[in-house]
Amino acid sequence: MAFAIDDKFVSIQFCEGGYDYSILGADYKLIDGGVYDNPDITIHAALNDILEDMGVSEQTERVPVDYEELMEKADTVEQAEIEANHVVSDFKAKTNEMFNDIEGQSPEDVEQTVHAHIMAKLEEYDIPVEIVDVVVSGSRCRGLEQEGSDLDVVVEYKGRESEDDLFNAFNEDGLMIGGVKVDINPITEGKTGTLATYLPGVESYLAEKQAMQKAPAVEVIPDTGGKY
């Protein structure tokens, strides 16, 4: 059985050794779950104990929902999350292969430095956002940079703060890594998108740029009107 309780969903069913339960957010993402290993009590008593651990009182309304439908939605969201993680991990793996280290610093080193920088800025300005991930992007992530190219880094976050405001906060000090200027670009799902939706566009753009760099130069012969 399953219930909608406040802004969450709770499902519970019999399993070997007790009761299997899941706590899902309003977006159907798994928050918590496991096995309640006391088969000697009823499923309703087990549910009450789980809800009590969540801080939910017995007086809180429990709206029954279809268990199978809830689990299907949760599985769909989980699969989408797995695919999104693959997009990001594959992009980072390619960057690791093609990135020209900056004074010995790898893409991972750069991402860690930028993460520490933005966390310090969030604390400085008391900005309540959650950082999802930090990814080296731009020409340097594919070894296509020119002399003087910035080091582009994209940061996905969750929160109400605007992308423009975070951009200003993250870049106001002019972060430099190995003498290279870092350009930090915050994105969020409600505007520019997630990393999973944003990075494929970056990949396509850089592939076109690489193809243009490899294309042979075409010699233009001026029109002399037949006179030599």
Tell where the protein language model's regions lie, with residue ranges:
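A short, charged, amphipathic alpha-helix used as a generic interaction element across diverse proteins
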Residues: 36-55
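Short N-terminal "domain-start" leader segments
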Residues: 1-20
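Catalytic core of pol beta-like nucleotidyltransferases
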Residues: 58, 81-149, 156-225
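Short, isolated positions in well-ordered beta-strands
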Residues: 10-11, 31, 182-184
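Negatively charged, low-complexity tracts enriched in Asp/Glu with abundant Ser/Thr
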Residues: 1-6, 32, 56-70
